[in-house]
Amino acid sequence: MKKSRKNGGGQSEELAHPPRTTFDYPVRLVAYTLIAAALCQLILLAVRGVGIEFVARENGPVELTQVGMALFASVCLMIAAVQMPFGRTLLIVCGCLVGYAAARECDSWFESVFFDDAYKYLAGVPLLGVALVALVRGRKRIVVESRVLLRTPSMTIFAIGGIYICTLCQAFDVPDLWTAGGLSESPEMTKAAVEEFAELFGYLLLAFSGIESLAMAFAHGNVETRSVESAAAEATCIELTTPQVDAPSRRAA
């Protein structure tokens, strides 16, 4: 009887504080779509206002925005790794990968201040060390945890953004793709513009995945005693607690 009362009391307490769905996953997806559409319009306005040479140049506004988004995603993933008791290894590795991508986008700055390929050594080596330490410490759990974590919205968006950047954007960077069709007034600038714009939206996806990592990690602020499946479900609001009509009768019994 005591156990049933305890369960009934816990259930009534949960019903008294239902999870908020104001910023659940479908709503965030709509917000992400609006942000991407707004970013596209800003690019068009910038090109028409100041010219494509300024917008798409090396270390220009678009590339600096890419760096900012990549750093944002990396920080979000690292914070999620600290907060989550499950899946930390994959989150840390992904955070290091995006951090290295941010450094790679700043390669010309690193070379102008330090030396050729400086980003590989000044940023890549430390990040590689962090990733290796995380892999060694989590080697016994990484396979199981990664299989579960890859089902979450955060890692799904991260994977899509990574595939997009590593395939389509790299194809855009091949000069023959733009010169084989014939000469134009500025084929190199056209190539650079399309590549930078395409990468920008890829990094935007990575930034969204960072937000989803935080949503999963801080789902109702109580993930210490639960698995990543329950945290992801709560963050996406897939499994909402619904009132039980027969709860009073159970307690009465």
Residue spans of the language-model regions?
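Juxtamembrane "helix-exit" motif on the non-cytosolic side of transmembrane helices
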Residues: 44-54, 104-114, 171-182
